[in-house]
Every structure is written in C-alpha cells, then in structure tokens.
C-alpha cells in the first residue's frame, strides 16, 4: 500500500522537524502554493484595484486580475517582494529563526543556509523582525509592572578600545512592561528603547502599551506620578529604605531585563548597532510572548510576512477609481468605502 502524504494546511500545520520542512517546502512550487493558500485562501484580491474573485494564471508565478489585467505574484507587497532569494530559502530562514529557542544571528543563519553574504542573512532577519510587530496589537491589562533598565551592547561603530582590544560598550536605556499573572507567573511583555527616564519618555510608553484602568505598579520615581490622572490604578513601590529588595518586589521586570541581556550576549554576542536595537527588542518580545507555543510563533510569522501592505493597496484602489472610473469625487468615495469594507472582511476571514 502506498503511503499518502497529506498536504499541510496553511496557517494551521507546522513542520515539527527539518525532515518535515523538506517534505513540505522542498521546491519553489510547494512554497508558492503554500503562500497562495495562506494569502488568498478565500479568493484572489488584486493588489492594484482591490477586485475580489478568481484570477487568470498568467504564468507559473503570476496571476492576472480579470478586472484591470494587472499581473501580480503572491509575494507582491510583502517582505518577499522583488527578492532574488528563493522562497524555500526564505521559509527555511523563518523555520530556523523560530525553531531555535534563543534565535539565530545573521552570521549563524549565513552558515546554516549557505548564503553568499552576511548582508543577505542580516537583511532577511531584519525583514522578519519588522513583521513581528502587528499593527494595532492588544495592550497589556490586569496587573502590569513597569520599570526601566540599562542594556549593555558592543557598539562596533565606535573605535576599538586600546585596553584589551575590545569594542566599546554602550549602555542603552529601555522601558519594560510585564503582565503579572495570579497566583504567580508572567504574561505578555513590551519593550522599548527610550532616551531617558523622564516623564516625557516613560508615560507615553505606558499609554501606548497598557490599557487604561489597568493596575500599573512602578517604583517610587516621580516620572510616573501622572498615571493616576490618566485613568490607571497606580501602585508605587518605594525601594529606598525598604527591607524587600527590588528584584523581589519588582520580580517581573528584573527577570525580563536579565533575560534580554543574556539573549543579546548569547545569541548576538552583545554586538548590536544602537540604531537597530528596537528591531531586536521586537524579536525578543515576539519570542517571549510565544514561549509556550509549539510552533514558537512560525505560524504567526508566516501569516504576517505573506500579508500585503494594506495601506499601499488602499492608495492604489483610490487612484484606480479616480483614473479609470470617470466618477465624481462623491461617487469615488462611496465606491471606495464599499470596496474597502469588502476587502477588510475578506482579509479578516483569511487571517
């Protein structure tokens, strides 16, 4: 009896090991088919005019819209757009990035996948990091600990120190927010690089990442005094003169700060350019918040990287109505709103 291989279901199935990955994504055709089902599982959406429905198969990789005859590929408008790197290499990078508990550096990815240059590996990882932050993601709620901590990194853009021939160490201040679960444990986290610990920096961070009415626990810093006026239940823990050490009373933020520092030193050998630190912090948040997931976030990541840039699509839709419809401004706006609602419903069903 012949063994039948069941095709993976996009957005649901996950290759548990490298052999599974090779069975599923061993060819470019398999990768294209997977991404097409993931992006257009409920029907083709033209990236130019936004028309919904079936499309012509113009070639192996191109689909043509029946309405405007625009040809596009499944990678149009995504992080794969116009890439010369094969899709199977991209998906292999995504699998390796998410399958490793501590992640992977650009040098490690270059070595494992046999990439031609370090820059290619770095660019791939940086594009994945951009996709790890979902616009409009949910804010933290419940009891949330907030504090700041310094992160030590090696700035390779600075001259090498004559003492020990080492790169100069730079300390970057970051804000940390950690959900505290009852009776114990931590929930989701948020991280952000901030220039200083003044109210102008920490209060906007709290407003961006924490729901109003949530309980926010901080140290005795005066920078957080306005939180009660902004609708938060503010609990101040004064460290000065307290018998309880800070790493006990604010265990969540201290634990996360230590994990971030260990991750930077272990995976990236402490070598991160300060200008790109926010992207690395986004990756750590993505990993930490999916630490209990069996797929370590690959399913979420592949969904996001295959999703088109909706803002660009909407702009093209509006231009298309103005240029070819012959409608006046009011009619264009009505048609645009109708098409936008239909597009949003289709994308919501697909993701």
Model-derived regions, located:
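Residue-level recognition of single "structural anchor" positions
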Residues: 1-351
């Amino acid at each position: 009896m012949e063994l039948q291989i069941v095709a993976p279901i996009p957005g649901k199935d996950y290759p548990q090991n490298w052999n599974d990955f090779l069975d599923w994504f061993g060819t470019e055709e398999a990768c294209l088919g997977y991404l097409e089902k993931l992006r257009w599982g409920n029907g083709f959406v033209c990236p130019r005019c936004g028309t919904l429905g079936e499309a012509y198969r113009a070639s192996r990789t191109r689909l043509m819209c029946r309405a405007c005859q625009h040809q596009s590929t499944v990678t149009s408008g995504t992080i794969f757009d116009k890439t010369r790197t094969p899709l199977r290499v991209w998906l292999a990078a995504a699998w390796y990035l998410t399958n490793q508990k501590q992640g992977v550096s650009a040098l490690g990815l270059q070595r494992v996948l046999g990439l031609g240059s370090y820059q290619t590996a770095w660019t791939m990882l940086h594009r994945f990091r951009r996709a790890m932050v979902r616009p409009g993601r949910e804010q933290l709620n419940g009891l949330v600990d907030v504090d700041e901590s310094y992160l030590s990194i090696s700035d390779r853009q600075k001259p090498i120190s004559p003492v020990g021939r080492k790169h100069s160490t730079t300390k970057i201040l970051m804000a940390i927010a950690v959900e505290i679960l009852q009776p114990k444990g931590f929930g989701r986290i948020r991280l952000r690089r901030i220039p200083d610990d003044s109210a102008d920096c920490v209060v906007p961070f709290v407003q961006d990442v924490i729901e109003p009415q949530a309980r926010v626990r901080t140290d005795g810093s005066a920078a957080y005094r306005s939180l009660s006026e902004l609708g938060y239940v503010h609990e101040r823990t004064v460290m000065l003169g307290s018998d309880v050490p800070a790493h006990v009373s604010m265990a969540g933020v201290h634990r996360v700060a230590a994990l971030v520092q260990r991750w930077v030193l272990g995976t990236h050998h402490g070598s991160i350019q300060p200008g790109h630190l926010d992207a690395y912090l986004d990756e750590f948040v993505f990993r930490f918040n999916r630490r209990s997931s069996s797929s370590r976030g690959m399913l979420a990541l592949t969904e996001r990287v295959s999703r088109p840039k909706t803002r660009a699509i909407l702009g093209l839709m509006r231009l298309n109505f103005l240029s070819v419809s012959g409608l006046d401004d009011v009619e264009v706006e009505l048609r645009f709103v109708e098409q936008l609602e239909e597009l949003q419903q289709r994308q919501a069903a697909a993701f």
